[in-house]
Amino acid sequence: MMADFQSIPLRPAAPVSHESLLQFPEDPVECMRQLHRRHGDIAVMEQESQRLAFVFSPELNRQVLTDSNSFHSRFFAVRGSRKSAQRRVTSGLLSQNGAEHRDTRRILKDVFSKKVLPGYHPTICRLTEDLLKDWHPGSERDLNVEMVQFMLRMTSALLFGLDDAGFAHELGHMIDRWVHQNHEVGMGALVSGPQFNSKYDELLEMADELENSIQTLFHKHRNQQHEMPNVLSLLFHAQASSQQLSDEKLTGHATLLFAAAHLTTAHTFSWTLFLLAQHPEIMQRVSGEVAEHVHGERPTIEELDRLEFLEHVIKESMRVLPASAYSQRIVAEPVTLNGIRLSPGTPVVFSQYITHHRPDLFESPDEFQPDRWKTISPSPYEYLPFGAGPRMCIGAPLAMAEIKTALALILKRCRLQMTANATVNGQVISTMLGPTSPIRAKVIPAGEETHTVPVHGSIHDLVRLPIEAMPQQQRRAA
């Protein structure tokens, strides 16, 4: 059962902990909780000559996320040699810094602007309807597996198009495997150890294969007329008016945009549907809102804009179980944070999860309470599911459109209830907080009541569920 976060003292001790840095990748959330409890807003872990710095307050989040001269981004820690495919496929927007990043973001901003979102709406609806074809009343679904596969199809279609859906889906699957391999070896760039180095050669081979497949896609895709709008077509259009967008750079952009979008959005779907299943009264309210405002089989853009409570549900899900639990910057020049001097090369971790669970920022922070969004308006550095500052996720509007549209379609047709004796585990892997077990739920017709069904698992260490949702032994402990 999760510790009472509100009882954690925030008065800092000396901010440096001399202990194994491997504690962080083994259990990032618990490690950060302990550091925050012990040291307050800033902490440093030291082991021999290695250091990891952590910031846990909105003000320090702001300093790290706005000072792009002192703190550089490195989306993937393992870049490969300068002439390697690994270097090229990791050279997109998310790995750029300084003037290069500003120029690229300016070129790409129209690709993800709100004015293009209506063009993606039919694809989002179509793929969600495909998902729901097998969601018959009484059937049991594994929300974890289904949302990962759903977002693999969705991200592939929106980024690469539906004209050759099979190839786009396979390319998306290839990128997904490559992302996982990066995690396997990438932590060694932050925390040295032989276990992080053994798969490096395999990663380089995967990058070669991935680059070749992306170039094949470019060849197929360029100069075609496409059934539906997609990001790659818009990237080619931007390339035609900018000499800065070579095919090599587009390869990096396409790879990293997919990597950033796929699993984070899949986890947001899984957690939101799980939280609704565990809070039947909220499920009933949001389903009622959808039924009241969505009159056809598909929600229109105007109808989606009227779903205020659904928006609150999504915001609260991303607060209490943020798919991006933490991220990091690398110190680029000597800098001081809260009196702590940091040298170039030092990783600095900031945590959405810890910030979102601070009781001085959010009342009862470990509870899922969508109604809090009626009265609160947190700053961008207090609530940052998509990051903040000049590097805030460029695809945030598209991600929100996907989530809101798909959830409206799902809730229009059904509700969900957890199956008996389910175990739900969550863990941070490669900065992302996602399910590591099945999330087994039963499909209930839209008009019927649902009930809270107790679940087991480490989910209770991450979020405070209603007392009815706790197994009997945990109810007694509570």
Label each region the model flagged:
Residues 89-90, 255, 260, 298-302, ...:
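Cytochrome P450 heme-thiolate "Cys pocket" and heme-binding signature region
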